[in-house]
Amino acid sequence: MDILLYFTVHWGAMTDLANKQKPRWGKKFKDKRHWPSTNELYVVRGMYFLDLDWVENWDVELEEMNRGKVGHPYEFPESLIQLQGLWKAKNIPYRMIEGITRQLFNIAGLPAYNNYTTVCRRINRLDVQIRLPEGTVIELTFEDGTGFQAINGGEYLREKYGKKNRMWVQVVMLGDPKTKEPVGFEVNLVPSSEPESAIRQLENMIEQNIEVKGFGSDGAMDDKRLWNACDEYGINAVIKPDKDARSDGESPQRNWNVKYRNKHGYDKWAKKVGYGMRWPATEGIFSAIKRIFGEQLLARSDVGLVQEAGLKVWAYHRLKHGVVG
């Protein structure tokens, strides 16, 4: 038995190594980054986890938040909660967040500190949606979904939503391939239709007077509802059609893409429509989020799981912009 186990483990490892040593297809990647400035950028990002520039406006911010408020007034400004939300996105427990805030109160002149129950309540109410300025023009955005692992709420999810949906919280994101930033996202406890999520997000952007010129995704999103939505809103669709797709369907755009791909081949089609930009707009962003903030969720409740997953995407977007308070 031990020999069989040894053989299985080591043969698998050797097979993986052999696969990794195979020559990669396509052009060899050339890293053109200027490493001194790139390194400094990553160092500066760490400063945002302790950015206290907003503290001087503590009283002004509280006064604005409490103007016209009914009931008990806010005691802690939203900027503090946003900073604590950044820590929470790193999977720091609420009690430890209280401890960090206490130390800032002791050594950095923070006017006051909140206890962990207040931190939890305020973070779960924090608006983590990405809000682009009105009039923003998005030349091209790609959609993809991923999952974050609910390590404490796994049993709860299994009991409430069924065995198939246990332990993973779905995030459907729209990303910009040029800025390599998320421009919108949706969190679902129970995995839902990605095409429907993409349509909702596109419609929300249009309602906010944000112009989306192009939208793309992989073959899993080859859905007539999504093609028709792009036709309706005048959005250039860069969606990979199914290999057996017909070219006489409802969507003029889909028909054109199918005909061009069938005539010229996948590679020329992908180059023509810019499909190769999908990776930096989706998988690249998800990879960065999970490297910085992890893919595990510590929350147990519905609200906590949804908020914690959203916090990770929101926090990454703020880090990219150098914004905390």
Predicted regions and their residues:
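Intrinsically disordered, low-complexity and often Lys/Arg-enriched segments
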Residues: 1-25, 325
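Helix-centered, glycine/charged polyanion-binding patches within enzymatic domains
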Residues: 15-31, 219-290
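Basic, amphipathic alpha-helical segments enriched in Lys/Arg and hydrophobic/aromatic residues
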Residues: 86-89, 267-325
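Polybasic low-complexity intrinsically disordered regions
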Residues: 68-92, 99, 112-233, 247, ...
